[in-house]
Amino acid sequence: MCRIAGAPRTLLPLLAALLQASVEASGEIALCKTGFPEDVYSAVLPKDVHEGQPLLNVKFSNCNRKRKVQYESSEPADFKVDEDGTVYAVRSFPLTAEQAKFLIYAQDKETQEKWQVAVNLSREPTLTEEPMKEPHEIEEIVFPRQLAKHSGALQRQKRDWVIPPINLPENSRGPFPQELVRIRSDRDKNLSLRYSVTGPGADQPPTGIFIINPISGQLSVTKPLDRELIARFHLRAHAVDINGNQVENPIDIVINVIDMNDNRPEFLHQVWNGSVPEGSKPGTYVMTVTAIDADDPNALNGMLRYRILSQAPSTPSPNMFTINNETGDIITVAAGLDREKVQQYTLIIQATDMEGNPTYGLSNTATAVITVTDVNDNPPEFTAMTFYGEVPENRVDVIVANLTVTDKDQPHTPAWNAAYRISGGDPTGRFAILTDPNSNDGLVTVVKPIDFETNRMFVLTVAAENQVPLAKGIQHPPQSTATVSVTVIDVNENPYFAPNPKIIRQEEGLHAGTMLTTLTAQDPDRYMQQNIRYTKLSDPANWLKIDPVNGQITTIAVLDRESPNVKNNIYNATFLASDNGIPPMSGTGTLQIYLLDINDNAPQVLPQEAETCETPEPNSINITALDYDIDPNAGPFAFDLPLSPVTIKRNWTINRLNGDFAQLNLKIKFLEAGIYEVPIIITDSGNPPKSNISILRVKVCQCDSNGDCTDVDRIVGAGLGTGAIIAILLCIIILLILVLMFVVWMKRRDKERQAKQLLIDPEDDVRDNILKYDEEGGGEEDQDYDLSQLQQPDTVEPDAIKPVGIRRLDERPIHAEPQYPVRSAAPHPGDIGDFINEGLKAADNDPTAPPYDSLLVFDYEGSGSTAGSLSSLNSSSSGGDQDYDYLNDWGPRFKKLADMYGGGDD
């Protein structure tokens, strides 16, 4: 049929509202589903529709739930929906022969969930109208009429239609291309037009899904659609003439892909894990499982429902859990969850679309694993009512007893972990109970020393609890309390001194043999008959001794407060007390002697060395006194000069500045520079006072205008100490030893040079009597000889006719030899290097000395040797028959040869 895009609603005739709702009864009880029970509502109306006229009624099922649903029409300008689902006409308009299509939306006000249903309104046919077109006829979409000029004025066109969308189901089986609508312009009667469509699905990706016949305007789809990929296509239709000029304004064409139930629900996880505490009441939330469906969630195809297919194990009830069919929330519906009996439940969950319709809906399953978590519903119970243990006295951190308990709760959880406490029998807190994290046992431990002589046994009352309180309604049984009997074992303890340290006050200077005090040690083992012996452990100055039996301490030397072993007037000595127990034990005690000072040290001058100028002005010497005693046996001091020698008071004068300082000055106008020893009498304030003549070494020197000595040497340089003298002597001795070693080394070096040979042994050295022999050639260059001269010895010329160039190099030249300077005498054997260098220089300057860079010709000795080889040259007699004594006459060069053959029997 024809859909006029530009036709106004006022042209639709009003027909009586006739609702045709057909629901096929299948004989089965359908499951309740929320939403519209029908996919499409249709009504046949009269030609004229009046404002406020009820047209039809749409039903909405909320499955007995009090949903507040609000209705809305896709064409609010023409239709409205009342709260009860009645559809009214907003205005009056004639209903045309074509169908009027629109959508009705229902939305939950609370959850914002939305449903929709299609409504088709058709006009009741009349006798004068053409019969209805066949169903296979294609719907047309006509371009709206344009504004046109008429009699020089513009005419307004009537309000255009908003073209309803085209609904096209997904997964259509064709055949393809499948015709949808025909797009046409009213101007095709006068012009030759060309039609085209643009937009995604046509000329934009994905391209080629929709095509249009450019001449007829037939719009077709070329392949099945998938709503899950693209749910809506928005195309634009164009009409141009054959020259490409736009004839009509483009119109929008919306193609909705209608969802089909082609996707099964998919769970987000195949295995869901949840937990619930044991003993939970019915209605306790456990977990939520969720599945999704790729189909339209606002249609039945995407509306899921959940249910539990099975539960394992089925104890104590086969229906311990239930699931909300819409949300997937799993809750408990029965009591009796006990982890000690069933620790885990496995549920098979099914999700079905089509609102759970088992006939038409698609389903999928997942597994829900529910773990029953432990609660503290089982208190710990001791395995015995009384536990026993023992501990040696004075021992700490010792495990006395091991307490064992049983707990049926899950191990290593707060409901199983035991916490022990001592409820009685330990008022002073000498014991503590630790928990073994692995075995959950209680370890009774001693944390404070126990004295056998005070407590021989303890009876403790202990209680066992958990780290978390017991579940509501659970009480601790009597087995959660036990008794621990601890026996204390007597051991040999250390003797001890009281008080320790012991402090006494004594004057220094006590003579040896003076009894100071008695140290007495006590043995805490009252029930053991033991003897104590005393020994000295520490006595830094070795002043004391102790009686081994009674502990009496006596001096063996004079006590001196000024000793370096006395710190802050206190002398410390340590003594040891040992018993004869098994094993023997010992204890230490300290004696502190506070030494009172006596005036036993005379004062000394300080400093002991000073310097002054030769004249009284401009400086003087400030002195003080050093006294190792303390007040009142020290200062104030009195300073004076002795009467003898008389030069002291003649040259010097001393003035007391205060009780601790005095000033020494020159009394005469000039004193020659030098070192002077000035005796000074110093008296302290002790009772009786103690005096001392102390020597002050004064260096008198020449001074500059500032009163400073111009001498470089200090007073210490006036004399050498013993150490300096020893150092100087050692340096002198070391220097002498080095010189002596150098002389010995030089002499030995000279001897080695005399004994060293140049080319031969020292005994063969004949440089004092040089012998000259004929030389047969030079160095390497004379080895390059002519083999032909050796192979043809007959061609050798006589000496008289030999050319000069081929004479033997070892022959003396015939002409007069040039005179060369006579070589100097051989140098001393110690300077072998100089001797070799001089000989080399002389040989280089001698033109007659071989070798020459020339051919060497040797004398011809005849041919035809009777000896075929060197081995054939054998003496007619043995070596013993020959006399080699003549070798001794050949000189030192043949001495070795003479020794070899003339050595007699050797």
UniProtKB/Swiss-Prot annotation:
SMART domains in UniProt: CA, Cadherin_pro
Tissue occurrence: Expressed in cardiac muscle (at protein level).
Binding site residues for Ca(2+) 1: E170, D226, E228, D262
Extracellular-side segments: 160-724
Membrane topology: Single-pass type I membrane protein
Keywords carried by this UniProt record: Calcium, Cell adhesion, Cell junction, Cell membrane, Cleavage on pair of basic residues, Glycoprotein, Membrane, Metal-binding, Phosphoprotein, Repeat, Signal, Transmembrane, Transmembrane helix
Compositionally biased intervals (Low complexity): 863-880
GO molecular function: alpha-catenin binding; beta-catenin binding; calcium ion binding; enzyme binding; gamma-catenin binding; identical protein binding; protein kinase binding; protein phosphatase binding
Residues modified by glycosylation: N190, N273, N325, N402, N572, N651, N692
GO cellular component term of the entry, any: cortical actin cytoskeleton
Binding residues annotated for Ca(2+) 2, in chain numbering: E170, E228, D259, M260, D262, D295
Known partners and oligomeric status: Homodimer (via extracellular region). Can also form heterodimers with other cadherins (via extracellular region). Dimerization occurs in trans, i.e. with a cadherin chain from another cell. Interacts with CDCP1. Interacts with PCDH8; this complex may also include TAOK2. The interaction with PCDH8 may lead to internalization through TAOK2/p38 MAPK pathway. Identified in a complex containing FGFR4, NCAM1, CDH2, PLCG1, FRS2, SRC, SHC1, GAP43 and CTTN. May interact with OBSCN (via protein kinase domain 2). Interacts with FBXO45.
Xref: PANTHER family: CADHERIN-2, CADHERIN-23
Function: Calcium-dependent cell adhesion protein; preferentially mediates homotypic cell-cell adhesion by dimerization with a CDH2 chain from another cell. Cadherins may thus contribute to the sorting of heterogeneous cell types. Acts as a regulator of neural stem cells quiescence by mediating anchorage of neural stem cells to ependymocytes in the adult subependymal zone: upon cleavage by MMP24, CDH2-mediated anchorage is affected, leading to modulate neural stem cell quiescence.
Name of the protein in question: Cadherin-2
Lineage of the species this protein comes from: Eukaryota, Metazoa, Chordata, Craniata, Vertebrata
